[in-house]
């Protein structure tokens, strides 16, 4: 799910969709309006799910999509290799995700973990 906002309403640390990917805004720079033009904004962001750096350049009055990012908790049901089966603690639905190598030793069966969901993608949100 996503919604539209004007570029001038964006803030650092919030989310934005650039190249059909949910991103976290790292910096926003705005230029002054010229004699015949509108102010421009440059948004630097990092992909929430892939970690790639992306940028957007456009008028401050332009509208841009912002993803609706949800943080939820789930219980680890089973771990098979690098695939983990989780059950959402809110609606009790089950789903499987691939766990990155750096998180494999931090999750155990029966524990609760938090995860992020946006634009139909899911990512573990394990904070150390």
UniProtKB/Swiss-Prot annotation:
NCBIfam families (alphabetical): eIF_5A, PRK03999.1
PANTHER family xref list: TRANSLATION INITIATION FACTOR 5A FAMILY MEMBER
InterPro entries attached to this UniProt entry: IF5A-like, IF5A-like_N, NA-bd_OB-fold, Rib_uL2_dom2, Trans_elong_IF5A_hypusine_site, Transl_elong_IF5A_arc, Transl_elong_IF5A_C, Translation_prot_SH3-like_sf
Gene name in the database record: eif5a
Principal location listed in the UniProt entry: cytoplasm
Signal peptide: none
Organism: Methanosarcina barkeri (strain Fusaro / DSM 804)
Primary role: Functions by promoting the formation of the first peptide bond.
Residues with PTM Hypusine: 35
GO BP, sorted A to Z: positive regulation of translational elongation; positive regulation of translational termination
Protein name per Swiss-Prot or TrEMBL: Translation initiation factor 5A
Cellular component terms per the entry's GO annotation: cytoplasm
